[in-house]
């Protein structure tokens, strides 16, 4: 998020709720954390272009199918006139719609809670704060369902 730290999250594709949070230093690539973001029940995982090649890693789970986004430059190079390229572009739009669910908790933390920048207090302390913030974002996202169940 800020000062060379990244928050990697695993979220449910249907509900958008965060189930896994990993805090790493800024120089750790996304693909390194990819398989640790899975909770074990997934058969399909969707990631952005930073996760390309994840299925080839030694820690990759064999029973998980990864759908990883195309690099932006390759997507721009697709020709809309060719039927095959148009189908590939449509598939990329579907993947982007699923990935948007993962980005929504970041929006809740930054816009609704105001945590755009964080003071770096150490990896463990900042990761603990991220875990708390994502738990609160989960509560915020299911607030209407919880209130409806109340009465």
Residue ranges and their predicted role:
Residues 1-62, 71, 131-137, 145:
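Polybasic low-complexity intrinsically disordered regions
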Residues 13-16, 75-77, 104, 151:
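A generic short-segment signal for beta-strand/edge and adjacent turn/coil regions
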Residues 43-44, 49-128:
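Helix-centered, glycine/charged polyanion-binding patches within enzymatic domains
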Residues 79, 124, 134-137, 147:
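Compositionally biased amphipathic helical and low-complexity segments enriched in hydrophobic
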Residues 144-151:
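A short, flexible helix-boundary coil/loop motif
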């Amino acid at each position: 998020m800020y000062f060379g730290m990244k928050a990697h999250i695993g979220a449910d594709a249907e509900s958008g709720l965060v189930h896994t949070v990993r805090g790493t230093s800024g120089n750790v690539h996304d693909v390194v954390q990819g398989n640790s973001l899975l909770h074990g029940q997934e058969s399909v995982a969707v990631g952005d272009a930073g996760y390309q090649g994840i299925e080839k890693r030694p820690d990759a789970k064999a029973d998980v199918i990864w759908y990883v986004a195309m690099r932006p430059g390759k997507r721009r190079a697709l020709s809309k006139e060719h039927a095959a390229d148009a189908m590939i572009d449509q598939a990329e739009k579907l993947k982007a719609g699923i990935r948007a669910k993962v980005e929504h908790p970041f929006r809740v933390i930054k816009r609704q809670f105001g945590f755009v920048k964080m003071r770096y207090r150490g990896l463990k302390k900042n990761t603990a704060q991220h875990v708390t913030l994502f738990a609160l974002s989960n509560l915020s996202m299911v607030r209407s369902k919880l209130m409806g169940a109340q009465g």
